[in-house]
Curated annotation (Swiss-Prot):
One of its GO terms (molecular function) is structural constituent of ribosome. Belongs to the universal ribosomal protein uL15 family. One of its GO terms (biological process) is translation. The gene is rpl-28. Residues 1-14, 21-30 have a biased composition (Basic residues). The lineage of its organism: Eukaryota, Fungi, Dikarya, Ascomycota, Pezizomycotina. Gene3D superfamilies: 3.100.10.10. It is found in: Cytoplasm. Component of the large ribosomal subunit (LSU). Mature N.crassa ribosomes consist of a small (40S) and a large (60S) subunit. The 40S small subunit contains 1 molecule of ribosomal RNA (18S rRNA) and at least 32 different proteins. The large 60S subunit contains 3 rRNA molecules (26S, 5.8S and 5S rRNA) and at least 42 different proteins. The keyword Lipid metabolism does not apply. This is Large ribosomal subunit protein uL15.
Length: 149
């Protein structure tokens, strides 16, 4: 809005500019921010912000966050971590002297579970945790599991 249209322009020449008697409109009459939340602003806080004051629950002093962090991956999705051109090479049988190495931690997974089917191609899997079913299926395919910390 242009300055020439503002209300303060219309108040020029009138002593208190619409703020009452001289000296009445002061800076922060109720305090700044949340001041007086338990005193003169209590009714507002009780109505619109219940539970703002006080404590809830107990503290956990030495809390270890992500203590049981173990994102899972099923073996049916295991080969999706191998690049497409390399996957074709291994599954077709062109590369028989080497096996792909999949490090689950570097892909953001910690635990390998055994849901799904696996192509009968040897594979080396590095993971923190491996279920018994996943271990059995990988070994049947001629693969190896390396547990890493």
């Amino acid at each position: 809005m242009p300055t020439r249209f503002s209300k303060t322009r219309k108040h020029r020449g009138h002593v208190s500019a619409g703020k009452g008697r001289v000296g009445k409109h002061r800076k922060h009459p109720g305090g700044r921010g949340m001041a007086g939340g338990q005193h003169h602003h209590r009714t507002n806080l009780d109505k619109y912000h219940p539970g703002y004051f006080g404590k809830v629950g107990m503290r956990h002093f030495h809390l270890l966050r992500n203590h049981q962090w173990a994102p899972i991956l099923n073996i049916e999705k295991l080969w999706t971590l191998v690049p497409a051109e390399a996957r074709e090479k291994y599954v077709s049988g062109a590369a028989t002297e080497t096996a792909p190495v999949i490090d689950l931690l570097s892909h953001g997974y910690a635990k390998l579970l055994g849901k799904g089917r696996l192509p009968q191609v040897p594979i080396v899997v590095r993971a923190r945790y491996v279920s018994a079913e996943a271990e059995r299926k990988i070994k049947e395919a001629g693969g190896v599991i390396e547990l890493v910390a």
